[in-house]
């Protein structure tokens, strides 16, 4: 009799995705981040569900309901900090995953890559709206500043902002709708993840060499199930270290002050994972220009496949491109640092230089390096 996992309509899908899936024999730890993102999403949905049981999305009670969760609910503090720091782990894995895609040329799987970009936008939107929910000072002012950016859109801007706010400022209506969206989006993300995997399994995984590996495949189980499990344990260990020893390390102390529309915090800044984009936004002294640069800082990922000039897929054997890639990483770290600094000399100039460099590397220097490397191949 044939094994049930190969015949049952539902188990067959699981089998072809997680058990008998042919996988390249040489994929490194950089290929662990996809499954880690799945784990992060699961952690966020579960902790978020339990938080939603005790949270109230009303301006009068939102802040105190979060306090109530931390003080009075059994292990509420643990659930809350797992959720808050889980978001940080989510973004660490996301950026590593995208970086891996750029380094090893995984963006040549166009459908998978484009769904991935949509996923990135969806996760960023979810994280932003989640940050508003505790209704602290940084929640309120962060929401005010970021939603206000839409007013830079010509003609419809102001109307659009008031429509999103549900009034003439960030208030009750805004908080309630942000909670609704924050609750529904992770499930939409989960559906998009399924599509992401569907497209990936059409082509199979890429590998570090960038060379087709059809002649050398191994079954996903047990080789990569055990490898993913090791990744899971590492991620959970790191998350628990963060949650149990320094839960507020990555947060802003201003968010422990209840939201007050009459008192602006001296430095309005988003969570650390948005600082690089925030720095790019602030580098341009024009509102609409800044907003366009902000959107393009992520949307530029969609252009990367079009700029692939190399005869090789991966950067594994391309030292010039490798050097540029790591300069790009350093540049993003610089932007992250600048995003958290006040708008004054010398930070303004550093931010502007780093922003120009960010776009230059991706749009100009990397394609040029690829062409140079193609020439070197002929020597």
Curated annotation (Swiss-Prot):
Keyword Nucleus: no
Lineage of the species this protein comes from: Eukaryota, Metazoa, Chordata, Craniata, Vertebrata
Free-text function comment from the UniProt entry: Component of the ubiquinol-cytochrome c reductase complex (complex III or cytochrome b-c1 complex) that is part of the mitochondrial respiratory chain. The b-c1 complex mediates electron transfer from ubiquinol to cytochrome c. Contributes to the generation of a proton gradient across the mitochondrial membrane that is then used for ATP synthesis.
Entry's Gene Ontology BP terms: mitochondrial electron transport, ubiquinol to cytochrome c
Chain sites annotated for binding heme b b562: 83, 182
Cofactor note: Binds 2 heme b groups non-covalently.
Keywords noted in UniProt: Electron transport, Heme, Iron, Membrane, Metal-binding, Mitochondrion, Mitochondrion inner membrane, Respiratory chain, Transmembrane, Transmembrane helix, Transport, Ubiquinone
Family per record: Belongs to the cytochrome b family.
Molecular-function GO term, any one: metal ion binding
PANTHER family reported for this sequence: CYTOCHROME B
Keyword Ribonucleoprotein: no
Amino-acid positions noted as binding a ubiquinone in the UniProt annotation, renumbered to this chain: 201
Subcellular location as annotated: Mitochondrion inner membrane
Subunit structure: The cytochrome bc1 complex contains 11 subunits: 3 respiratory subunits (MT-CYB, CYC1 and UQCRFS1), 2 core proteins (UQCRC1 and UQCRC2) and 6 low-molecular weight proteins (UQCRH/QCR6, UQCRB/QCR7, UQCRQ/QCR8, UQCR10/QCR9, UQCR11/QCR10 and a cleavage product of UQCRFS1). This cytochrome bc1 complex then forms a dimer.
Annotated heme b b566 binding sites: 97, 196
TM annotation in the entry: 33-53, 77-98, 113-133, 178-198, 226-246, 288-308, 320-340, 347-367
Cofactor(s) listed in the protein's UniProt record: heme b
Name of the protein this chain belongs to: Cytochrome b
Protein species of origin: Lepus brachyurus (Japanese hare)
Note: Heme 1 (or BL or b562) is low-potential and absorbs at about 562 nm, and heme 2 (or BH or b566) is high-potential and absorbs at about 566 nm.
